[in-house]
């Protein structure tokens, strides 16, 4: 652990803010996709997209809280631009790519935290990486269904309810854990 405590803390705050910016982008991207899927009458897909966006909101808040605990200022800037007007198959392919890149980045951020001796933030990244992995698996599964079954799968989803209710907890907390 090279460097003084303030330098180590600054490095952790830096990666936390990078992660927060990634989460803020994901929130905007996934909510835009939620609205698009809902407009196309793919309610079940829209509802799950909203739940995943809620997970990302929780992640952004968790990062902000940790940044504040360390004496930093949470960023309000999102990383990247929101892509609009995507076809349904493209949504799931691009979101899987985004989640994969997020997992890779967070794994690097986790290493930084461990190198700086911040086990609390390292544990936060470990927990969030697990949730991002659940999102990746979901996007890959839906993408595979769309690729293999095409319009047949989408017809099955068309007309399904999109409401997630007012007490939505997010995708990870709403999905039963694998036993």
Swiss-Prot record:
* Gene Ontology MF: a single term: ferric iron binding
Provide the binding site for Fe cation 1: 23, 56, 59, 132
Q: Which domain of life is it from?
A: Bacteria
A single GO cellular-component term from the record reads: cytosol
Q: List the disulfide bonds.
A: none
A biological process from GO: iron ion transport
Write down the top EC class of this protein: oxidoreductase
- Cofactor notes: Binds 1 Fe-coproporphyrin III group per dimer.
- One Pfam family recorded for the sequence: Ferritin
Entry cofactors: Fe-coproporphyrin III; Fe cation
Q: Which residues form the Ferritin-like diiron domain?
A: 1-150
**Amino acids binding Fe cation 2:** 56, 99, 132, 135
Catalytic activity entry: 4 Fe(2+) + O2 + 4 H(+) = 4 Fe(3+) + 2 H2O; Fe(2+)(in) = Fe(2+)(out)
Q: Which EC numbers characterise this protein's activity in its record?
A: 1.16.3.1
Is ATP-binding one of the keywords UniProt gives this record? no
Positions binding Fe-coproporphyrin III in this chain are 57
Query: Sorted alphabetically, which keywords does the UniProt record give?
Result: Heme, Iron, Iron storage, Metal-binding, Oxidoreductase
State the SUPFAM superfamilies in the record. Answer: Ferritin-like
Q: What else is known?
A: The catalytic dinuclear iron-binding site within each subunit is known as the ferroxidase center.
The job of this chain, per UniProt, is described as:
Iron-storage protein, whose ferroxidase center binds Fe(2+), oxidizes it using dioxygen to Fe(3+), and participates in the subsequent Fe(3+) oxide mineral core formation within the central cavity of the BFR protein shell.
Oligomeric state and partners?
Answer: Homooligomer of 24 subunits, arranged as 12 dimers, that are packed together to form an approximately spherical molecule with a central cavity, in which large amounts of iron can be deposited.
Its name, as the record gives it, is: Bacterioferritin
What is the species of this protein?
Answer: Desulfovibrio desulfuricans (strain ATCC 27774 / DSM 6949 / MB)
